[in-house]
């Protein structure tokens, strides 16, 4: 049996296809979903969603910018603030953005809490895009 997986952002459907397995970036760690999984509602962190399709045993990567996932009767519905398929991300641009975000994060003054939070969020977004594009494992 397979899962029906939908990834929906405010402006587009990022993914809508059958899959054998899904790995979600939940706020408490990675969460694997197979057919027959118990019903579930979970918050998602900024990170990489991995989907193994029935047609190909390869994993597809999708960068997610946080959201929620619901699992119900072999249907996985993922509502995200933003999402981008790894195969549409330019690897070199993602590598540059990741490096720049890492540098900015390291340069934030220790006492500037708001700047630290913003730089950390930018770093997590850049890392997710770079990972989804195949730059980091």
From Swiss-Prot:
Membrane topology summary = Peripheral membrane protein
Q: Tell me which positions the record assigns to the signal sequence.
A: none
A cellular component annotation (GO) from this entry? proton-transporting ATP synthase complex
| Gene Ontology MF terms in the entry | ATP binding; proton-transporting ATP synthase activity, rotational mechanism
SUPFAM superfamilies recorded:
Epsilon subunit of F1F0-ATP synthase N-terminal domain (SSF51344)
**NCBIfam families per the UniProt record, alphabetical:** ATP_synt_epsi (TIGR01216), PRK13442.1 (NF009977)
State the oligomer form and interacting partners.
F-type ATPases have 2 components, CF(1) - the catalytic core - and CF(0) - the membrane proton channel. CF(1) has five subunits: alpha(3), beta(3), gamma(1), delta(1), epsilon(1). CF(0) has three main subunits: a, b and c.
Q: What is this protein called?
A: ATP synthase epsilon chain
Q: Which organism is it from?
A: Trichormus variabilis (strain ATCC 29413 / PCC 7937) (Anabaena variabilis)
């Amino acid at each position: 049996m397979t899962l029906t997986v939908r990834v929906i952002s405010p402006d587009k459907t990022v993914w809508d296809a059958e899959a054998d397995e899904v790995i979600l970036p939940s706020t408490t760690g990675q969460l694997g979903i197979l057919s027959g999984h118990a019903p579930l509602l979970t918050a998602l962190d900024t990170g990489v969603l991995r989907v193994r399709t029935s047609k190909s045993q390869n994993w597809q990567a999708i960068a997610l910018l946080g959201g929620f996932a619901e699992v119900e009767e072999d249907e996985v519905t993922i509502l995200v603030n933003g999402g981008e398929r790894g195969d549409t991300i330019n690897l070199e641009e993602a590598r540059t953005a990741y490096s720049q975000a890492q540098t900015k994060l390291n340069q934030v003054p220790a006492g500037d809490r708001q700047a630290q939070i913003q730089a950390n969020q930018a770093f997590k977004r850049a890392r997710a895009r770079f990972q989804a594009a195949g730059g980091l494992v």
